[in-house]
């Protein structure tokens, strides 16, 4: 069973192409606001595939590891751009699939380099962010490499708001991510 969480529609196509070549069931969690974005299409769109269980490093950095997926990945990238003006270098990792999850421990390798980690998720507290946290911190032993406490940023624990304005106040936003990471860098 696969649980796929693409960050955009090109990644979704790559995942669908991978699924067409397999015989296994899957759940595809598409980010709805991804339909409104313009993306550069690869020349090999029908052959393009995304490997499952292998996170992709979207941005290399040395100070902190940001782990996310789907729609919140763009928000994390905006926050990393803001933090760059303060000389904070963020490594951003897109998990791509929740099942299987990071089979080569790529997130752990990043944590060994940065010694700080934050998991960002648009789900409720205790959802996918907690799952990713458990996998990296407990199962892979990531706690051994921490200089500060690991953190999660999730949606607020209330009924989801409606519309883009509601998303800003209900789900993680770039300013919230920036503030938390600045705080972590001071510890």
Segments predicted by a language model, with ranges:
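Thiamine diphosphate
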Residues: 32-187
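Short, high-confidence coil segments that cap the C-terminus of an alpha-helix
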Residues: 23-24, 114
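Conserved thiamine diphosphate
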Residues: 1-22, 89, 160, 180-185
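A generic secondary-structure signal marking the coil-to-beta-strand transition
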Residues: 24-25, 149
């Amino acid at each position: 069973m696969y649980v796929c969480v693409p960050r955009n529609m090109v990644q979704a196509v790559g995942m669908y192409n991978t699924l067409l070549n397999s015989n296994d069931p899957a759940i595809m969690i598409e980010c709805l606001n991804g339909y409104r974005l313009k993306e550069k299409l690869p020349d090999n769109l029908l052959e393009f595939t995304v490997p499952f269980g292998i996170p992709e490093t979207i941005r290399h950095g040395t100070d902190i590891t940001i782990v996310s997926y789907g729609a919140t990945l763009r928000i994390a990238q905006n926050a990393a751009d803001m933090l760059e003006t303060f000389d904070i270098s963020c490594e951003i990792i897109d998990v791509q699939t929740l099942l299987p999850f990071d089979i080569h421990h790529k997130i752990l390798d990043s944590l060994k380099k940065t010694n700080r980690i934050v998991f960002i998720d648009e789900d409720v507290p205790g959802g996918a962010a907690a799952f990713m946290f458990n996998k990296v911190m407990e199962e892979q032993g990531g706690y051994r490499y921490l200089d500060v406490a690991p953190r999660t940023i999730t949606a607020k624990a209330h009924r989801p708001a409606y519309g883009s304005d509601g998303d800003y106040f209900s789900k993680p936003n770039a300013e919230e991510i920036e503030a938390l990471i600045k705080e972590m860098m001071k510890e």
